[in-house]
């Protein structure tokens, strides 16, 4: 018989009375935790369905589709059966073991410290986080040891998800074994659905503790202690990055285990390794950077594999980056022109996007000179190094028992030149820089509080980025040239490409290219860019530039005036429910939602 217990307040797991055929699972609903008991063998139990559904938000458009793409159904029976087979052993290093149940086991991590000696039956499963790319479940064993089960959303192709999981697990393995960094140990994984859990997954060590983000206050006013407070978050992340940068690789791409890359890629060693146990453990394969998979589900894996590396040169890497975007857009354009697309397409906009990426292809290998005498330590800046795109205090857990920072989430980690790496998002700032409010802003003292806050925001963001650059200079003075405004300007088109999120974001790419025109001749003269001719590589007509400027301004106005545009139309569920209850959010005949302006003015939304 099914029992439900609802608790309001602190999220927690519930213990299960001893029984051989029942399993407890719980899920977080806002500030509530629901606990449900189900029979392990009852795969059709309707009480399970909601356990797999996405609940942390809703979308203004295509809500049902977006939720369906984030459903994380897996075999509870399969997980339970797999856990029973855990046999703790010593930490002797062996190759990843492909098991008959379709999973891959890293048995060197099956230690008593992580698993305990006995009692490996699954006691409970709790949904503890629904992120942007995957969902996190906490699995509690009968001996009260806890594990993390991470399941990706179906936002990308099966090919992309398989590569992503294979690479992330190998990267975690490399960070733990080679660099001795604090990361969760992976016990097992399945890169495809053909395994006992019937879904791609990673099963890893659970780290108990608080997020480092709890200590991050980016808008803390300047004081005697403010810099020290900010550095408590910046410094451990810089320490981690410093260790990432300590290994230079032999090519560009992403890390994989030896057996997960092609025979051709197996022949190329990733870096110079002296430890015989590690020499043939990893190889460099196709890049898992998100730009090679985002919005490319329609492209066949054979087509994408022509462009996603690995590469022996930066120039080829940049050309392929442009090519994969053009190929994807041309495919979409062909479907739209043949009335075969499964979505409404703006044909004119697709053509503009293609033109922008063609422009990027022309200029990509001319942006930065790999042998520039004007760029300090340019050879070091162009060497292949690990880059983690989600280095963030949100992805750092301060372990409860040791107070050591443990780093999590290495999706889309790649090997590329440090000169092309972006700053971590929590410190990066692309706006107008302010270094001294009273000296740079006339009349600042006499402004009202609202106006002051706008300038203070710009100042604090500038300050935080500078603190990151100071930390980089202290750790890797040989790489500090990336802080140059000229380097930032020259690599801006590349960064706009890899960070492109929506179809209209191509305008930011074009704008970054256009902004180089004014300085191009000087960059050529000083040998900073990789060109010997002072003429700008792309010919823009006045008509093209005027149209681009108009389109960009309209897009920026659209983003500024459209509710939830910054989150892609995603609304936190508590807020969504409140707005809907107050008739501020209204559903139309197509199942999409819009803001009812009159209702919003009459009934301002309350805090959820």
Swiss-Prot record:
InterPro entries: Aminoglycoside_PTrfase, Kinase-like_dom_sf, Mito_inheritance_9. It comes from the Eukaryota. Coiled coil: none annotated. Gene3D superfamilies: Phosphorylase Kinase, domain 1 (3.30.200.20). Residues 1-21 form a transit peptide. This is Altered inheritance of mitochondria protein 9, mitochondrial. Keywords: Mitochondrion, Transit peptide. The keyword Mitochondrion applies. Pfam families: APH. The keyword Mitochondrion applies. It comes from Clavispora lusitaniae (strain ATCC 42720). Belongs to the AIM9 family. PANTHER family: ALTERED INHERITANCE OF MITOCHONDRIA PROTEIN 9, MITOCHONDRIAL (PTHR36091:SF1). One of its GO terms (cellular component) is mitochondrion. It is found in: Mitochondrion. Its main location: mitochondrion.
């Amino acid at each position: 018989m099914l029992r439900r217990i609802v608790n309001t307040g602190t999220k927690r797991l519930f213990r299960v009375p001893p029984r051989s055929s029942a399993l407890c699972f719980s899920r977080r609903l806002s500030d509530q935790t629901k606990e449900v008991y189900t029979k392990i063998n009852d795969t059709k139990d309707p009480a399970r369905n909601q356990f797999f559904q996405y609940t942390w938000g809703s979308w203004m458009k295509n809500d049902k589709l977006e939720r369906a793409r984030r459903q994380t159904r897996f075999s509870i029976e399969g997980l339970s059966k797999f856990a029973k087979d855990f046999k703790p052993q010593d930490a002797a290093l062996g190759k990843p073991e492909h098991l008959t149940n379709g999973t891959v086991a890293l048995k060197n991590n099956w230690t008593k410290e992580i698993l305990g000696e006995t009692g490996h039956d699954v006691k409970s499963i709790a949904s503890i986080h629904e992120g942007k790319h995957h969902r996190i479940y906490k699995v509690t064993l009968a001996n009260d040891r806890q594990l993390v089960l991470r399941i990706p959303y179906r936002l990308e192709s099966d090919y992309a998800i398989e590569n992503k999981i294979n690479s992330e697990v190998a990267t975690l393995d490399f960070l733990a074994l080679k660099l001795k960094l604090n990361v969760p140990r992976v016990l097992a994984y399945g890169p495809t659905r053909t395994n006992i859990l019937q879904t791609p997954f990673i099963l890893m060590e659970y780290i108990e503790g608080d997020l480092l983000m709890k200590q991050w206050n980016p808008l803390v006013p300047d004081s005697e202690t403010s810099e020290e407070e900010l550095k408590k978050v910046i410094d451990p992340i810089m320490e981690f990055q410093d260790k990432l940068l300590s290994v230079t690789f032999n090519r560009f791409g992403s890390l994989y285990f030896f057996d997960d890359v092609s025979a051709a890629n197996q022949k190329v060693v990733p870096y110079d390794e002296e430890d015989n146990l590690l020499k043939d453990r990893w190889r460099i394969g196709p890049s898992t950077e998100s730009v090679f998979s985002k919005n490319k589900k329609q492209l066949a894996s054979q087509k994408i594999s022509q462009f996603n590396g690995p590469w022996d040169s930066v120039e080829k890497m940049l050309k392929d980056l442009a090519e994969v975007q053009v190929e994807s857009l041309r495919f979409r354009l062909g479907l739209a022109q043949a009335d075969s697309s499964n979505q409404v397409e703006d044909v004119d906009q697709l053509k503009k996007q293609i033109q922008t990426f063609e422009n990027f292809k022309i200029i990509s290998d001319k942006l930065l000179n790999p042998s520039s005498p004007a760029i300090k330590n340019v050879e070091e800046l162009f060497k292949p190094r690990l880059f983690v795109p989600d280095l963030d205090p949100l992805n750092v857990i301060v372990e409860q028992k040791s107070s050591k920072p443990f780093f999590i989430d290495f999706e889309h980690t790649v090997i590329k030149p440090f000169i092309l790496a972006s700053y971590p998002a929590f410190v990066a700032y692309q706006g107008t820089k302010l270094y001294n409010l009273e000296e740079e802003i006339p009349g600042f003292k006499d402004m009202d509080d609202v106006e002051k806050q706008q300038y203070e925001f710009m100042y604090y963001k500038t300050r935080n980025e500078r603190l990151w650059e100071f930390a980089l200079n202290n750790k890797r003075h040989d790489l500090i040239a990336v802080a140059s405004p000229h380097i930032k300007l020259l690599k801006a088109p590349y960064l706009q490409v890899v960070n492109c999120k929506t179809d209209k974001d191509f305008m930011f790419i074009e704008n970054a290219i256009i902004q180089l025109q004014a300085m191009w001749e000087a960059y050529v003269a000083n040998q900073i860019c990789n060109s010997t001719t002072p003429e700008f590589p792309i010919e823009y007509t006045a008509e093209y530039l005027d149209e681009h400027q108009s389109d960009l301004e309209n897009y920026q106005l659209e983003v500024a005036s459209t509710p939830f545009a910054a989150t892609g139309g995603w609304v936190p569920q508590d807020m969504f429910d409140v707005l809907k209850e107050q008739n501020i959010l209204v559903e139309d005949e197509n199942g999409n939602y819009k803001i009812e302006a009159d209702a919003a003015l009459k009934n301002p939304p309350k805090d959820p």
